[in-house]
Structures are given as structure tokens and as C-alpha cells.
From Swiss-Prot:
One BP term from GO: translation
Single GO cellular component term: cytoplasm
Family from the record: Belongs to the universal ribosomal protein uS14 family.
Molecular function in Gene Ontology: rRNA binding; structural constituent of ribosome
NCBIfam families tied to this protein: PRK08881.1 (NF006477)
Organism: Aster yellows witches'-broom phytoplasma (strain AYWB)
Entry keyword set: Ribonucleoprotein, Ribosomal protein, RNA-binding, rRNA-binding
Described function: Binds 16S rRNA, required for the assembly of 30S particles and may also be responsible for determining the conformation of the 16S rRNA at the A site.
Protein name: Small ribosomal subunit protein uS14
The encoding gene: rpsN
Subunit-level organization: Part of the 30S ribosomal subunit. Contacts proteins S3 and S10.
Classification via SUPFAM superfamilies: Glucocorticoid receptor-like (DNA-binding domain)
Pfam family, one: Ribosomal_S14
Amino acid sequence: MAKKSKIVKDQKQRELVLKYSKLRLELKKKADYAGLSQIPAKASPVRLKNRDSIDGRPRGYIRKFGISRINFRQLAHQGKLPGVRKTSW
């Protein structure tokens, strides 16, 4: 599990990206790069790091579910992920 501070930092950064998303889009359409430079750099969605929504793990992230491979496996075995079935071949 990641440190609580990392999880909180990630949540705050995601809120910041949402807050400035409309403004960034408008400034990009106008090609107002001077205005874009006035927005905080952390408000750019490119700077987001994918982290597990449950425990904040930064590696082994599965985008479709928003969780790490470890939590994916646990939840899949418990049957808590709809549409996920164990396969064998």
C-alpha cells in the first residue's frame, strides 16, 4: 500500500485537472499559449500518474478497471468485478 500522502496528493491533482479542464480546452482552441502558461502546470492531464484507486499502488495498473493487478486478482476471485471470469485453456 502506498503512503497516505501519495494517495491524497494524487486525489488533489485529479481534482485540479478537473477544475481547469474546461479553461484549458478553451485556451487551446484560441491558441492562447500565454494564457495556458498562467494555469498551474499540475493541472495538465499529461502529468497524472495512474494509481490504484483502492490502495494507491503506482505499478501494475489496469486502466479498464482503475486498479492494480493485485487488487484485480483479489476482487475477481471474490466475484466483485462484473463480467470478469476465470479462464483456462
